[in-house]
């Protein structure tokens, strides 16, 4: 196989690949065998039709076309590996030449234009040091968390006063346009100030007592008259306020497994400290990545960036063509950081020779599927059909690259070393974690294990 590479941009390359006949012949034979299983030729059993007869029956062009479709991904992957090119998107492939008959010695020749990861050099990981803020927990933090727990055990009691923000009102609603009733609801329970129904409802309800009513103008948000202005009459049937339980030992026993309020507070503080330490580890990880990126002028692949910006805008609930300059800027900044982080972590994973097995990918995807209530088997099959397995593999590698990378870096808090092994993992902890990962997810994914090929780099990021 002959490969030539022309760099169109720092992040874009065009490969011209010429496949030797002895490399292409096996694909022709496989294509003939597959077609032989599908055709009927008198005197021959299915699957046992000679190759020459297959060529005659369906035409060499059909055989060669099937062979080319199977050969291109393999030859492209080999070319990427040989030329050390790391793609960041699906290639644009064009067949330039191919044999037109069994006797034609024309070689298969095709081009592949692809956006690639640019070349850059990571800094030396040894001896790096960074100071991280101390993970502090205040009494206010504990009281706020306790207040949230207390809120969950609140009860609603009727009140004989005008409604105010935070109250729960039982209301009847009637909407009219041009004097005609277009919608009505009765006995609706609504938290005043929540803003979950019509615009203007919160303001209309504040100050009303049970039995009182008022009318306000609003825009209807559903039904046949969605988007129309309407006069909305609201009547208050009852007003209830939240009554919070006393903070005492009885509350601690009702809300937790602890006997006293002091024990409950101690547990809350312990949990908040664990959360703070987790955030501290995340800050350390982000600082590690930022340090790797310092001084690196990494060009971003334009096509990949544009597609990601469009997806980012969609996630913000904005159509790309209708985005304001501020929204577009926000999306572009988020994508630029995301892309740069991905490329740096990919390079780090290669530098550290991070290994990712099929089981690792299965467990990773299985956990995602479970989070979204999906069947892991079906989820993985869908990713395979869309060519995204390689992306998942790289995501696992990026995550794993951070652990050994951060271990080589010294983190300090107030001048004292910070131990992040509990969050970033030691080799022993990672090995144990792998054993403890979801067996169910791996078993569910095993049905597609035979079809999962190694990452050929053609997956879109």
UniProtKB/Swiss-Prot annotation:
Isomerase keyword on record: yes
Alphabetical keyword list: Cell cycle, Cell division, Chaperone, Cytoplasm, Isomerase, Rotamase
Cross-referenced InterPro entries: PPIase_dom_sf, PPIase_FKBP_dom, Trig_fac, Trigger_fac_C, Trigger_fac_C_sf, Trigger_fac_ribosome-bd_bac, Trigger_fac_ribosome-bd_sf, Trigger_fact/SurA_dom_sf
Pfam families: FKBP_C (PF00254), Trigger_C (PF05698), Trigger_N (PF05697)
Reactions mediated catalytically: [protein]-peptidylproline (omega=180) = [protein]-peptidylproline (omega=0)
GO biological process entries: 'de novo' cotranslational protein folding; cell division; chaperone-mediated protein folding; protein transport; protein unfolding
Domain PPIase FKBP-type positions: 166-245
EC number: 5.2.1.8
Job of this protein: Involved in protein export. Acts as a chaperone by maintaining the newly synthesized protein in an open conformation. Functions as a peptidyl-prolyl cis-trans isomerase.
Protein name, entry field: Trigger factor
Species this chain originates from: Bifidobacterium animalis subsp. lactis (strain AD011)
